[in-house]
Amino acid sequence: NDKRTGGEIDYDPTKDKFTTNHYGLGITTNRYEEFAKIGYVFPQKKYKSFGWQLSSFQHQQDSYFGLTTYNAKQNNFYSNLIYQSIIGTTANKFRTGFSFVYDQYKEDFRDVNYNRNEIVPGAFFEYTYSYSDKFNVVAGMRVDHDNLYGFFATPRLHIRYEPIKGTTVRVSGGRGERTANIFAENLGILISSRQVNIIGGVPGKAYGLNPEIAWNEGINIDQKFKLFKRAGTISIDYFRTDFQNQVVVDVDKSARQVDFYNLSGKSYSNSFQFEIDHEIISKLDLRLAYRLFDVKTAYHGDLLERPLVAKHRAFANLAYEQKGWKLDYTITYNGTKRIPFTGNNPVQYQLPERSPSYISMNAQVSKTLGKKHPLDIYLGSENLTNYYQKNPVLASDQPFGPYFDASMVWGPLTGRMFYAGFRYRIK
């Protein structure tokens, strides 16, 4: 269970809720989960087994954002029956089975109901080929039937190859399909005065929109090395996702509305990451990383960068551990981000097209005392550069006016912070 309240400093929910005295918001969440696992392994054939997984949850969220209400309830049931065995030898393994998913959604947004029941039975088959520890392939296919969207297939392929000792190459690819939950996945946009428009009109489908469908593929290369007789690892990742359909969240057509609609045009993401880990001297580890995140989507015909997503990020970490002492220092570079269009607002409520880039730093030192019942004492600081976004809430002086928008967050919201504490473990 979780309950959160926010808003203006003077906001008092007992007096100001659903009034225009002071702006406030509240989110109350209750969630209950149940699960069970049953399995049987054949005594004479350890490679052969049955498994049955069962789970369910009930999730309820009651929330308000100023004068806007959003209440949602989800009941979920999941069943998965798995049979595992081999084909000839243990180098050829397979898993197959049946699954069943039931989801009941009851959503109420601004007094409009968006209810649906999704029933998705399916079957799957997965084959694994292993050749020693150097090469293996996992190929899978599942076919499901969604009562709202019909049949769909999701193939998947994973290959792992170790051509030489210390070098590992992984390749993967496949297809995915899902139903977007447009309100629950975009709560931040509700903390604004934007008019919400759902442009779909497909009867019998969730919000009148099509499911999201994407193909993705990627490669990962890990290389172990030694430098000055000390071990290290270099890791390179590249992944690409191409959407056949996507529920587009468009906040660019107007600063005073958000449109949800099916993709018409291109949408893709390219993710490249380079990381190096190395013990540069005794007990001192260095980690360096760089990530390129190229994400673009067609918004009303214009192919644009995804808003509020940094294309470039870099990271460096130093970690030292000796005789109970631990020191950790991290510096992060966050590149510039595209800010959604605000040009049809009055001048005082317009934002620049891009955010500035910025650097943040965190540090912590800790000392462990005792062995039988260790006590950790720590001292640290976050955001050492004291860089934070000034005036993150657009039109904060008129929270119930037409230009109010608290969703344009591109940087830290709090300045430099120091903390201290201790951890005591009882074995």
Segments the model singles out, each with a brief description of its role:
Residues 1-50, 56-74:
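Flexible loop and strand-edge segments within Gram-negative outer membrane beta-barrel domains
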Residues 49-63, 162, 170, 207-262, ...:
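Membrane-embedded beta-barrel scaffold of Gram-negative outer-membrane proteins
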Residues 40-42, 81-87, 129, 143, ...:
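Residue-level signature of outer-membrane beta-barrel architecture
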Residues 335-342, 367-427:
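C-terminal beta-signal and adjacent terminal beta-strands/loops
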Residues 2-4, 42, 56-60, 89, ...:
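Transmembrane beta-strands of outer-membrane beta-barrel pores
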Residues 132, 235-242, 262-342:
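Gram-negative outer-membrane beta-barrel transporters
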Residues 44-66, 93-102, 108, 114-160, ...:
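Surface-exposed extracellular loop regions of Gram-negative outer-membrane beta-barrel proteins
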Residues 2-3, 44-50, 89-94, 134-137, ...:
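Repeated loop/turn-to-beta-strand initiation elements of outer-membrane beta-barrel proteins
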